[in-house]
Amino acid sequence: VLARTRKHEENEEENDMTDKERFKAIFETQVMRAGAEKLLEWLESTDFFEAPASTRFHGAYPGGLVAHSLNVYDQLLFDHSALKYGGQTLAVCALLHDVCKANYYHRDSDGWTVRDTLPMGHGEKSVYLIQKHMSLTDEEALAIRWHMGAYDEAYRGGSRALGEAQERCALVMALHQADMRATQQEKLREGL
């Protein structure tokens, strides 16, 4: 009972936080590797915490990207196949899978538009940007690279690497499914 009470109190405290505060609290307590502080500093220098998650499909509002990242984190924690990777890896993958969207969307008179200054693909761009500041394990890199699943341009172009990545690493499918569940929940909440 005491453990449940403490967990309830922690959840209440977490609910009082902004999404940015919650993201930073999770990141700072879970990610303990060289470069993590520099990565967080870089994120703060971008629009990551104010950016939308998309132009119109889900989270198309200021702060939608960080809200989506937290939703993916929450979903990934429910996936028993992912738990074996540990808290640090789950936080890295879920919280950072869409860092490619930092400084990516811009507001205009019609809403949000895309201005991609580094057009290298979605998942691979996130891996690249993270590794400019902090190293990733092979499993983390695979999961982030392929988190779009069959929606990834390389897969749609005929690449077989997605299937190989999923066979080698359960985290690839776990992150993809967490991302899809979070997106669907967001779309329902937003009436899309």
Task: Show which residues each predicted segment covers.
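Metal-dependent phosphohydrolase cores
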Residues: 2, 6-192
